[in-house]
Amino acid sequence: MSLVLISAVQTLLKRVEERTGKPIAAIEKSDLPMSAEIKITAKNETAHQLFYRKGYDEQINYIIANQCGHILRLFDAPADQRFMPIANYRTMMSYIMEMGAECHRFAHLFDPEKIKRMVRLWYEGVVFQLTKMPPDIMIDKWLYNEYPDLRSIQLKSLIRQRQAAVQSLTSDTRKFTPDKIYRVSNIMNYVFFKVLEDHFRLDWVAPYHGTIFIFDGSALATLTERNYINNHTGDRAMIDAWAQRLDLTTWFEWKKYET
């Protein structure tokens, strides 16, 4: 199955090729967890790889556009100022040492192997939100403003993301999630949708009214809107600001990106 994309996304891919100085090779891959993923070149590689899953739908356009946004922001920074957020053994151990006692309360509910999987999933989920959501806010604003042909697909994707976020407010999710994970994840969801709600002029955070997340979330949303510097350096600063506010500073590290 060949990859067919709308013209706006084709334009973005060309911008990535021009900005990075390397071509993008599209490769069908059946076992992808999402419909598309761009793997930027390692030091000695000659081309970026755009993996896509057979049977994709129109949402692939937004997924690829979003990833192009991340790459362009990274490469717009001077080479010696490009950094990638990473999780490693050290950051994972910091998380486990902090959360071990809280995770232990689930020992009577699940078998040890399932708890191990859940502990990793909780960690990966929060770090993904923390390191992706702040730049995603700026990328989504930019895509909405600059690529109107993508707008309807973008909004459908964000509505789907919002529905998943709202589902995490349920009592069942609360019951089977460590307190800190539940709290910081919902605060980050609130901030993301609050800032975009204001930009898109939509009502996206009504389900959070009456929850405890609106208090810390409102303060962090205000900080995000007022203080965000719209570039890669600003992305790093805002991710660090979120991490500081949410007490997640040891759960990830920055690594210099080498081309």
Language-model segments: what does each one mean?
Residues 126-139:
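Solvent-exposed aromatic/hydrophobic patches embedded in short alpha-helical segments
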Residues 1-44, 56-57, 78, 125, ...:
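Auxiliary, metal-adjacent structural segments of Zn-dependent hydrolase domains
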Residues 73-124:
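Post-HEXXH active-site segment of zinc metalloproteases
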Residues 48-64:
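Short pre-active-site segment immediately N-terminal to the catalytic Zn-binding motif
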Residues 63, 67-75:
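Catalytic glutamate of the conserved HExxH
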Residues 6, 111-112, 136, 230-231:
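Helix N-terminus capping/helix-initiation residues
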